[in-house]
């Protein structure tokens, strides 16, 4: 497995776990090329483990006056700079023969108030970390820092090919057309099973036991797809067949409607004998006279 040794940029906070710091002053210079003081700042809220540091600097110069505040997270040890995935190989972490109680820090302040920290009267610290290539290319945070350098390929040539292979092997999100809301992570391309054609055929591979002796490969039969026939549903309950008895229908004859002409009833020829008895006016007069006589007596 290939190893890559990376010289990280100096981080002034690496010295804090090994130096007994208290509240002290900081000399801020305008940039790395100038040594004249740009402002005076002060450290506040030191903790024994030096993992969090509140830094407040008041910048005084003829052109501007501003207050810079920053909350800095510091590593517990120098070896934490190489984590995760790295092995600390050493480097200058302490300055020999430091007579001052408080180290002097210089920084460059831009127009927006951002401060870039660096050691001033101390020699630049080079922290060397060893990484395994397979683990290094998977460390997104560290790779982002390496990729910021324009000449990272020439500086770390052993990283080029493994990093490109890792990028190609990353799983990609494929959204199936059948369900757009369901992302499926896959490393292979999804292709249709049957290519589009005018005739849709289905390839069926026969069983090995059905092969003819002369043939060496499995038989392949082309069966055209047909529409499935709907099965006939058979009821499990017994069907009772009742014989149908036809009864003679009764014919109900209704009298034909009578024809009315000018207020007179013209009887039909078919019902003439049924109305002949009561249709005579002489008989009606006799019956009426008999009834009247009975009432009088």
From Swiss-Prot:
Residues 175-199 are annotated as: Disordered. It comes from the Viruses. Glycans are attached at residue 269. Keywords: Glycoprotein, Membrane, Transmembrane, Transmembrane helix. Residues 176-185 have a biased composition (Polar residues). It is a single-pass membrane protein. GO terms for cellular component: membrane. It is found in: Membrane. The chain crosses the membrane at residues 277-297. Belongs to the ascovirus HvAV ORF18 family. This is Uncharacterized protein ORF18. It comes from Heliothis virescens ascovirus 3e.
